[in-house]
Amino acid sequence: MSLPIYLIGARGCGKTTVGQALALALGYDFCDTDHYLQQARQQTVADIVAIEGWAGFRAREAESLKAVTAASKVIATGGGMVLAEENRLYMREHGRVIYLNANALVLAARLEAYPLADQRPTLTGRPVAEEMVEVLAARDALYQLAAHHIIDAMQTPDAVVNQIVSSLSLARAS
């Protein structure tokens, strides 16, 4: 049985894009926890946050993580999935965790170009570049703590996929 692969990292690091390509390369299924949650609740992330607040959203996010976990699956998680220790431990115990690491300026540029940005409420209400600096400062240590592998996500999606496949192969060989 092949363990699930969890992709973690800040918004805009490429978890969904890389995850879909990685799943294809490995012959795995793909799931995005935010998309799963939105389909299950028939609400956008922004709607869930508006109705239940961030704490309610984080609780639903944790439920989604457990619901989608299965063997031979690549799972793109929400950027804040690592905030709860329960989620970090769950991912480490049930699969391989890959941190897609990118700097704040790259993330901000990607988010500003992303057409569905209105579905992702800002955490601080400030411009996206400022927010990404603050979010990364607060979360980078948590991403590193949760990760089995840290991958440079400032490359092309294909290069990121190749680096992940190599890292996973090296881990299996050791």
Curated annotation (Swiss-Prot):
InterPro entries: P-loop_NTPase (IPR027417), Shikimate/glucono_kinase (IPR031322), Shikimate_kinase/TSH1 (IPR000623), Shikimate_kinase_2 (IPR027544), Shikimate_kinase_CS (IPR023000). Pathway: Metabolic intermediate biosynthesis; chorismate biosynthesis; chorismate from D-erythrose 4-phosphate and phosphoenolpyruvate: step 5/7. Catalyzes the specific phosphorylation of the 3-hydroxyl group of shikimic acid using ATP as a cosubstrate. The LID domain closes over the active site upon ATP binding. This is Shikimate kinase 2. The lineage of its organism: Bacteria, Pseudomonadati, Pseudomonadota, Gammaproteobacteria, Enterobacterales. Monomer. Its EC number is 2.7.1.71. One of its GO terms (cellular component) is cytosol. The keyword ATP-binding applies. It comes from the Bacteria. PROSITE patterns: SHIKIMATE_KINASE. Residues 112-126 are annotated as: LID domain. Keywords: Amino-acid biosynthesis, Aromatic amino acid biosynthesis, ATP-binding, Cytoplasm, Kinase, Magnesium, Metal-binding, Nucleotide-binding, Transferase. GO terms for biological process: amino acid biosynthetic process; aromatic amino acid family biosynthetic process; chorismate biosynthetic process. Binds 1 Mg(2+) ion per subunit. Transmembrane segments: none annotated.
